[in-house]
């Protein structure tokens, strides 16, 4: 169908990107003028920064810079342009580099050097679903690429204990082995990559998760969760710390690698290590097999103990994991070792926690519609569009004065 000229003009106007206001509009105009054509802005698919514009003092000179993600008719891949204001306050393009693929997966800022500058970390996705990471540094008017590498996961955290951040990069090699690298700046500000040998090929077939946090001793730790077992669907954890003397990641000295592997071996593929309670320490989930933790119900629920192996008292939290909704209900630590889970005969679809030795009811749990009555029940929270409720048995006394049933529900990552 051939459109009349006036209708064709209207359609083209609708297809054209809307004019942006303020700094964004000025940045887009400056970029288009520099290119001599209209740039197509590229929005990150996920992450905290979801704009094609990143406004930040990148070089640490006290003046705001701008990074813009875009493509043109001439470029197959996403490009990154750096703009600064001139003396008149107008944005000017200083430099542009071509990125690693046609889609921006995520963008973040990292302070990888002990200066006021910060680096731009861009994750790209190619058509074959390959993921590439680039780290860009803008110093003294020059945009340089510090790192270009294929990756599966990355993490920006302080691992080495300095005043700057580090970049943890995880990828699977062609032979199936897992490669984990630490990108860190030395005391002179130069970047270097440190290989992290955490997941031995004889035990692990891949890396499921990487988490970083503080330890009870104030040092910085890295927790790796690796795929293991005959099926490759089980998980076990490795705990590492940065050694100042050797400048390498080494196993934590509080527990041997072998003991930790055995203790953290678990058969729930989604149960990864994480900072459960928000205290900055990454807890490792374990499925204790000691007598008195029995699931006799039909549900996919497991008793879990979350451990901080950097502490002389590692047990942090004991409770019940619901695999179907991926939530965790914390229970009083004093109940550990003497609980069984059974289906409730009194309430449809509910489960009961009972003591193993005396078969005494201590708590009933159920998932109900959000409109259901709370009478006689404690509301724990909303899980999968339903309400999780709990009820303590009438004669149950909890010795732990800090335990709050109403605060017991955690939605896991």
Name the predicted role of every residue range:
Residues 396-413:
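Long protein-protein interaction modules used by eukaryotic assembly/scaffold proteins
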Residues 1-344, 373, 381-382, 387-391, ...:
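Beta-propeller-forming repeat regions
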Residues 334-375:
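Secretory pathway targeting signatures of secreted, lumenal, and periplasmic proteins
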